[in-house]
């Protein structure tokens, strides 16, 4: 049995088509990079859909929801897993990241009085404030927004039902190779 090898050239390879992967691929393409996205699942069916359509968005429930408070909530809810730099970064950019999702079609209910996404009435997931935003189509809404972020960009190619097995680094020539099945 012989295996056919196809050599391709990309500026950026993104592994995963969920929230982080789709948005990373979109950001790289926005900067002019030729992007390959590798997904183990069909596009729109990533593990991000497991979120059941909930997103943590700072200040969605109140104006005095500070970055430090959200970061601390995430650390406490995650036990010993969270890394301070990551929880701080998430807290700082949660509104901006959520707005990026909205640019790609995510449609929350809007609090008309405050002109922002409507948070759920109760604090969820270990949070001390109500900053969880729900969506009518639950996780499918996020899957669709991820799909939109990948498909509508001109420089994003993608492989579905594929596995990223290895990255071979050539430190002398900076000619790196990825093995994808």
Regions found by a protein language model. Give the residues of each.
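N-terminal Rossmann-like FAD-binding beta1-loop-alpha1 element of flavoenzymes
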Residues: 12-37
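A short, basic/flexible loop-to-alpha-helix module at the beginning of a structural domain
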Residues: 1-9
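Conserved N-terminal/central alpha/beta ligand/cofactor-binding core
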Residues: 3-4, 27, 33-34, 39-176
